[in-house]
Amino acid sequence: MSQTPKHIISIVPAAGIGSRMGAEIPKQYLQLNEQSILGHTLDCLLSHPSIEKVIVALNPEDEFFARLPQAQHAKLQAVIGGKERADSVLSALTVAPTDAWALVHDAARPCLNHQDIDKLIESASSFPQGAILGAPVRDTMKRSNAQGLITETVCREKLWHALTPQFFPVQNLKQNLSNALAAGALITDEASAMEWAGVAPGIVAGRADNIKVTHPDDLQLASLFLKSAAQ
C-alpha cells in the first residue's frame, strides 16, 4: 500500500474571466464576505500545513492579483496562465517539483475546508494513481434533445458531481495533460486528462457546500456557507 505523499503543492488556475457572471471584473476578484473569492480560496490552501507551495496561474493582463493581501505570501508563486483551464494548469505544472503531488483547485470554489483536503491527501494510500473530490448526484437526472424535450431519465446511481481539488502526481499529470492537449482532446478537468491516458482516478466524497461560483446567485449561497463555517 502506498504512503501519503511527502511533498504536496497546490495549483490554482485563475486566468479566466468568468463571463457568465456578467461582472465588470473577473469573477475570482468579486467581493464575498469582505474579501475576494480568490482570497478565500487562497486562505484555505495557504493555511493548510501539508501544502508546501501554492502556484497561481494568472491572465497576462491581470491587474487585480497584486492587490490581494495573499499575493506576498511566502508559500505563493504566480505564473502566467493560458487561454483555457488546462493550459493554465500545465503552465503551473512546469514550475512544480517533479517529485510532488498537486492539488488542483478552482479559483472560484471559496468554500473549501481542510477536512476535505485531508481526506483527499489520505486517499493516496488507496488511489496511488490519484483521485478527485466528488459529490454524489442527488437529483433525478434528465437528458434532453436540441428542442429542449426530455428524451431520457438517466439513472443517478454511481453518478457524481466532479469537484476540486483534484489530486495527482505532478509528473504523471504533466505528461498526460500535455499529451492530451497535443492530441486535441477535450479536457475539462485534470481527471479527464488522466482518463484520456487510460488511468481511472479514484473519487472521494466531499462536502456539497464546496460550490463553484459561476452565476450571480452562487455568490449569496457561498456567502451563507462561509458564514456558517465561521460560526
UniProtKB/Swiss-Prot annotation:
The record marks R156, K212 as: Positions MEP for the nucleophilic attack. Belongs to the IspD/TarI cytidylyltransferase family. IspD subfamily. This is 2-C-methyl-D-erythritol 4-phosphate cytidylyltransferase. One of its GO terms (molecular function) is 2-C-methyl-D-erythritol 4-phosphate cytidylyltransferase activity. GO terms for biological process: isopentenyl diphosphate biosynthetic process, methylerythritol 4-phosphate pathway. It comes from Shewanella pealeana (strain ATCC 700345 / ANG-SQ1). Its EC number is 2.7.7.60. Keywords: Isoprene biosynthesis, Nucleotidyltransferase, Transferase. It comes from the Bacteria. Pfam families: IspD.
